[in-house]
Amino acid sequence: MARKYFQREVLPVTALVIMECANVGLNTLFKAATLKGMSFHVFIVYSYGLAALLLLPSLFCSFRSRTLPPMNFSILYKIVLLGIIGCCSNIMGYTGINYSSPTLASAISNLTPAFTFLLAVVFRMESVSFKRTSSVAKMLGTVVSIGGAFIVTLYNGPVVIAKSPPSVSLRSQSTNPNWILGAGFLAVEYFCVPLWYIVQTQIMREYPAEFTVVCFYSIGVSFWTALVTLFTEGNDLGAWKIKPNIALVSIVCSGLFGSCINNTIHTWALRIKGPLFVAMFKPLSIAIAVAMGVIFLRDSLYIGSLIGATVITIGFYTVMWGKAKEVALVEDDNKANHEEANEADLDSPSGSQKAPLLESYKNDEHV
């Protein structure tokens, strides 16, 4: 029982928090690489190509598996669609970071839970009833988490820990045309992310093989982005050359920890917990970005960051409570239905006659 609880409750939370920390670091590394002149289209092609190579052995295991269903057209169609969504999401996201910063990317990602919740309701993956406290908790927690993330983004307040001269805030940068353009690209990305969650969840219901699906997905993203790169870069072969500097480090780290491990963990979490659960970890990224800035970059810590992080935590745990409440209600309903079915079998005439018929059959054999 304890092992099952750890695998279904503790492990997904721990893994997704670690992945949000990794994503903040990978976005910062990507920004440093693009400042050296690397094309972000080429970056996407190489990082997802590396992930596909790392996951390639999983294809042989899945095709030899007897427990998995056959890879039919419906599944392949959804994987192709997933690759197109992933290509659009990555291009929009990295374009946005290129025009703005990783911190703004973390801030705009707070729109993900709201978009995911709406799409999950539309596709009937989440139920909403104002009469149930679990549904109210999910809606309220989603709004509170988004609000807390925007507090971190837009409100500084007094300095709590002053380690360096005050850095330029998101609010002061909001008048920069490039910053606004970057925010627009990032908003499109974080509308594509919930679509990715929804489609991936549907694929997992039909074909529960995370490594195989992510491998095909990585091939698809690399292929579609390569076509876009041929159009954007033209005959510039120099854009495809990667120098042994921060660009190479960024591609390797993103391919291993981002495209490979991160996507696999998110796919696994989508299969066992659903899209809204996974999306609720996005507001944590802005708090993680602030914490990493204070610890590693010696940024100043403001009271607004502390207030916002507290609000995010309250909203996050409110949604988690609502999800746990729903799971408990479903389990209670299933248990009650099972008990009613057993009682009906015992009370039915056919159930009461099973023993006499068997006894009669035995007596006939001895005659």
UniProtKB/Swiss-Prot annotation:
One CC-aspect GO term: membrane
Give the Gene Ontology MF terms in alphabetical order.
Answer: transmembrane transporter activity
Residues in domain EamA? 25-153, 195-319
Task: Name the principal localization, coarsely classed.
Answer: membrane
Q: Give its localization.
A: Membrane
What is the membrane topology noted in the UniProt record heading this document?
Answer: Multi-pass membrane protein
SUPFAM superfamilies for this protein: Multidrug resistance efflux transporter EmrE (SSF103481)
**Transmembrane residue ranges:** 10-30, 40-60, 73-93, 103-123, 142-162, 179-199, 211-231, 246-266, 276-296, 301-321
Q: Which UniProt keywords apply?
A: Membrane, Repeat, Transmembrane, Transmembrane helix
Q: Which domain of life is it from?
A: Eukaryota
Q: Does the keyword Cell inner membrane apply?
A: no
Question: To which protein family does this belong?
Answer: Belongs to the drug/metabolite transporter (DMT) superfamily. Plant drug/metabolite exporter (P-DME) (TC 2.A.7.4) family.
Protein name according to UniProt: WAT1-related protein At3g28050
Q: Which organism is it from?
A: Arabidopsis thaliana
Q: What is the lineage of its organism?
A: Eukaryota, Viridiplantae, Streptophyta, Embryophyta, Tracheophyta
